Every structure is written in C-alpha cells, then in structure tokens.
Amino acid sequence: MKKFILAIAAAFMAASMASAQDMAQATELYNNGATAISMKNWTEALDCFQKALEMGKTIGADADELVANCKNAIPGVSLEIAKDLIKDAKYDEAAAKLDEVAKIAEEYENAEVAEKAKELVPQMWMQKGVDALKLKDFATAADGFAK
C-alpha cells in the first residue's frame, strides 16, 4: 500500500514539474514575441505568440493571463503584417491578410483592431489604383478604384 501511495505522489510531482516547465517555455515564447515586436519583426512575433497561446491553452488555469496577453497581441501583430504587405504593394496578399485580421480580432474580442482592418481595406484599394495610375496601367487602376 505504501508503494502505491508513493507511486501516486511521484506521478503528481512529475505532472506538476512538467506543467511548470511548459509554463516556462510558453512564457519564454511570449517574451520572444515581445522582443520581436520591438524589432518590428512581425512575422516572428506572430509565430511566437501563436505558439505561446497554444501551449497556454494546454496548460490550463495557470496560464490564463498568458493566454489573454497572447489573444491581445495577435490581432495587432497580424494587422502590422498586413500593413507591411500594403507598403510592399502586395495588395492581394494584404487583402487576404486583412480579412484574416478582422476574423481573428473579432474572435479574440478586439474591436479596435477589427475596425482598423476594415477601414484599411478601401484605403488599400485606393492606393493600388493610384500606384497603377502612376504607371499608366489604367485597367489595374480602374480595378483598384472600383473596389
């Protein structure tokens, strides 16, 4: 009977140690994401936050704050990626990313980012039209202005 109780106690200790290790890894990923933001490396930041979010969900209640922080960061970082695509004149990719941003922002209850993403869409198409007009690509300009 004592061996059985010791075995159960050892199992609980191992589980709690594994959970603490997972929490440390998730926190490290989150911190790496924050560092990537400061360097304006949006893609790396998004990757880190998404991984930290997934790890946090598996950890449970101990990671509620981490999960909330990730859900707060992910929509804004995704919006920055879309803005970079617009700056690089990758309008079709940016349009898809902005749709994704709006969905993610609504899912994570970030109305401000969702609104910004929706407001950016017509501005982006207008910019596409202006850029095409400068190149005398009238068909593409008309397409951009029509959207």
Task: List where the protein language model places each region.
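Alpha-helical junction/boundary sensor with strong preference for TPR arrays
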Residues: 56, 105-108
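TPR-repeat structural position
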Residues: 42, 91-92, 138
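"A position-specific structural signal for the A-helix of alpha-solenoid helical repeats
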Residues: 31, 73, 80, 116, ...
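Bacterial N-terminal signal peptides
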Residues: 7-15
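N-terminal leader/linker segments that initiate helical-solenoid repeat arrays
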Residues: 2, 18-83, 87-88
